[in-house]
Amino acid sequence: MPPSPLTDIQVRYLGRRDYRETWSAMRRYTDERGPDTPDQLWVVSHPPVYTLGQAGRREHILDPGEIPVVETDRGGQVTYHGPGQIVLYPLLDLRRWGLGVRSLVSALEHTVISLLAGYGIASEARDDAPGVYVEGRKVASVGLRVRRGCSYHGLAVNVDVDLEPFLRINPCGYPGLEVTRLLDLGVPTPYERLEADLALHCLEAIVEYGNGGAA
């Protein structure tokens, strides 16, 4: 059986943090891990920034304007982070949990799917484009990096984020992809409550998709 997430994954609520600094801290934490390093789940938001994954192409950034663009080492294409978005970064030793990359992606998607189901909202994942969708509109994005068997980067959920910056890119490399947010879906959006709810759903999904689970 996998360890209990409520005792063996430390949840850190970090508030608003610069993207580059957070990325650097994730890499440092991963590189310095040892056999006894605890797993952590970071809950954070970022000032406005576009991030370009390893598969990303600059032509998908249509008009960044004053918003900085950061080329990162996560998988995937281009996305936007900004205030009003909750970002979860699972810093996990995947072997402890019996997770592979695909099953961790599924766990992160299920985090949002299960949260929305609690509000009576049907959502789904797509095989061709990781993330969570409500009637074809993307409400959450997933992008990961695994190094030395350990994960970083993660899941971004649109709560009441300004959607205009998404119009300046092809989200996740898909021209015309529509984006939505929890506010427009009728989900009550007290931010601190949603942070805690998403963290709990994520911990539960890690167990479900880990050893002997749904992976």
UniProtKB/Swiss-Prot annotation:
<dbReference type="InterPro" id="IPR000544">
    <property type="entry name" value="Octanoyltransferase"/>
</dbReference>
<dbReference type="GO" id="GO:0033819">
    <property type="term" value="F:lipoyl(octanoyl) transferase activity"/>
</dbReference>
<dbReference type="GO" id="GO:0005737">
    <property type="term" value="C:cytoplasm"/>
</dbReference>
<dbReference type="GO" id="GO:0036211">
    <property type="term" value="P:protein modification process"/>
</dbReference>
<feature type="active site" description="Acyl-thioester intermediate">
    <location>
        <position position="172"/>
    </location>
</feature>
<keyword id="KW-0012">Acyltransferase</keyword>
<keyword id="KW-0808">Transferase</keyword>
<feature type="site" description="Lowers pKa of active site Cys">
    <location>
        <position position="138"/>
    </location>
</feature>
<protein>
    <recommendedName>
        <fullName>Octanoyltransferase</fullName>
        <ecNumber>2.3.1.181</ecNumber>
    </recommendedName>
</protein>
<comment type="similarity">
    <text>Belongs to the LipB family.</text>
</comment>
<feature type="binding site">
    <location>
        <begin position="141"/>
        <end position="143"/>
    </location>
    <ligand>
        <name>substrate</name>
    </ligand>
</feature>
<feature type="binding site">
    <location>
        <begin position="154"/>
        <end position="156"/>
    </location>
    <ligand>
        <name>substrate</name>
    </ligand>
</feature>
<dbReference type="InterPro" id="IPR004143">
    <property type="entry name" value="BPL_LPL_catalytic"/>
</dbReference>
<feature type="domain" description="BPL/LPL catalytic">
    <location>
        <begin position="35"/>
        <end position="210"/>
    </location>
</feature>
<dbReference type="InterPro" id="IPR045864">
    <property type="entry name" value="aa-tRNA-synth_II/BPL/LPL"/>
</dbReference>
<dbReference type="InterPro" id="IPR020605">
    <property type="entry name" value="Octanoyltransferase_CS"/>
</dbReference>
<keyword id="KW-0963">Cytoplasm</keyword>
<dbReference type="Pfam" id="PF21948">
    <property type="entry name" value="LplA-B_cat"/>
</dbReference>
<feature type="binding site">
    <location>
        <begin position="74"/>
        <end position="81"/>
    </location>
    <ligand>
        <name>substrate</name>
    </ligand>
</feature>
<comment type="function">
    <text>Catalyzes the transfer of endogenously produced octanoic acid from octanoyl-acyl-carrier-protein onto the lipoyl domains of lipoate-dependent enzymes. Lipoyl-ACP can also act as a substrate although octanoyl-ACP is likely to be the physiological substrate.</text>
</comment>
<comment type="pathway">
    <text>Protein modification; protein lipoylation via endogenous pathway; protein N(6)-(lipoyl)lysine from octanoyl-[acyl-carrier-protein]: step 1/2.</text>
</comment>
